[in-house]
Amino acid sequence: VSVLSFVDGNTIKIMSSAQDHKRAKDGDQGLNTGGMGNFSPSPFYTDEVDAFCKKYVYQATVDAMKAEGRPFKGVIFFGLMLTPEGPKVLEYNARFGDPEAQVVLPRMKNDIIDVFEACIDGTLDQIDLQFEDNACVCVVLASDGYPLAYEKGFEITGMENFKDKDGYYLFHAGSKFDENGKIVTNGGRVLGVTCLLYTSDA
């Protein structure tokens, strides 16, 4: 389970949970990747997990960094493994996750600029961070052969289908404009096709 957070050096505000799928192929098969898809919220991030992490992980991390003389402001990504003994922290990242951000941020009600300014100013405790009571899913379109060898330079078509469609997003990653102004593939993970859902049962 992935959990993103905003931090202002003292206060930490937790965003909604997300669940990443790392394997390159369907059915949880193939090599590990940077993430082939994600959805938010994660059904495995229960109230019990949330309470445990708020007590032992989130604020404790912020307090420890401050105690070491390096208070942190920005975004902290918590990569959690849920075990019979309770949640374990597998990794920290000082950034948004990809594709976690693609499914968490569309659900956020707050203006992200207000939240960032609060992180900078040390006033995050005054922000009531809220998320829509819905779900969001992102499927990554990857180049054939990823995460090993793959070709680049293939034209990407069909993007016009996302125009003026509320709740649908197309996030670019491994893409670029070629010399003719066409958008072509330029990496392994090319696009994140994302949709807001009214229910996670959909």
Language model: regions and residue ranges:
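Internal nucleotide-binding/catalytic subdomain
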Residues: 1-104
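Conserved small/polar residues in nucleotide/adenosyl-binding loops
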Residues: 198-202
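Active-site "cap" helix and flanking loop/linker of ATP-utilizing ligase/carboxylase catalytic domains
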Residues: 54-76, 93-165, 178
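Short, surface-exposed beta-edge/turn micro-motifs
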Residues: 1, 134-137, 190
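FAD-site-proximal beta/loop scaffold in flavoenzymes
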Residues: 170-176
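Short, well-ordered beta-strand elements within core beta-sheets of diverse protein domains
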Residues: 38-41, 140, 189-197
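C-terminal alpha-helical interaction appendages
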Residues: 176-186, 190
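Hydrophobic side chains in beta-strands
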Residues: 5, 82, 141-142, 172, ...
